[in-house]
A protein has these predicted regions:
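Conserved beta-loop-beta/alpha segment of the NTase-like Rossmann-fold superfamily
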Residues: 1-30, 48
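Short secondary-structure boundary/capping segments
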Residues: 7-8, 35-37, 80, 89
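Solvent-exposed alpha-helices and their adjacent loops that cap or buttress functional pockets
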Residues: 9-10, 37-38, 71-72, 92
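Intrinsically disordered, low-complexity segments enriched in polar/charged residues with Gly/Pro
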Residues: 13-14, 38-39, 85-87
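Short, flexible, basic/aromatic active-site loop/helix in glycosyltransferases
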Residues: 27-51
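Conserved alpha/beta core of the MobA/IspD/sugar-nucleotide pyrophosphorylase nucleotidyltransferase superfamily
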Residues: 45-122
């Protein structure tokens, strides 16, 4: 269970990030239209929720970020990476662990709810 694993890892190490290995091909683009660079996926992790932190550590990190002028992090895990020196521990996630933020996410959720595992998939 992802939540229980996050809690256990956070209690042991102070941070827990849910993530899955990247399977997609990743390109880097400066303009969003063209690319001449690919990023090797073997070291990439796609983060998911939940992300679990000890409250004191998280508050201290946000205060440090504010003092350093870091204001554009997209998530707590990226903030920790930008601050540096914080080793985050990854808890295995799932492709079915989707975050609902867009209409497309809702459509994916609806499709997942309709799927019945076939016996050959077990």
């Amino acid at each position: 269970d992802i939540i229980s694993s996050n809690i256990a890892i956070c209690q042991k190490y102070g941070y827990a990030i849910t993530g899955i290995k990247c399977r997609e091909a990743i390109l880097e683009s400066e303009d969003g239209f063209t690319s001449t660079t690919s990023i090797p996926r073997d070291k990439l992790i796609r983060t998911q929720t939940p992300q679990t932190f000890r409250l004191g550590n998280l508050i201290a990190a946000h205060e440090e970020a504010k003092a350093k002028g870091i204001t554009n992090s997209v998530a707590s895990c990226t903030l920790m990476a930008e601050l540096g020196g914080r080793q985050m521990h990854v808890v295995p996630g799932s492709e079915k662990n989707i975050k609902i933020t867009t209409i497309e996410d809702l459509e994916i959720l609806k499709a997942l709810m309709k799927v019945q595992p076939e016996s050959w998939l077990k």
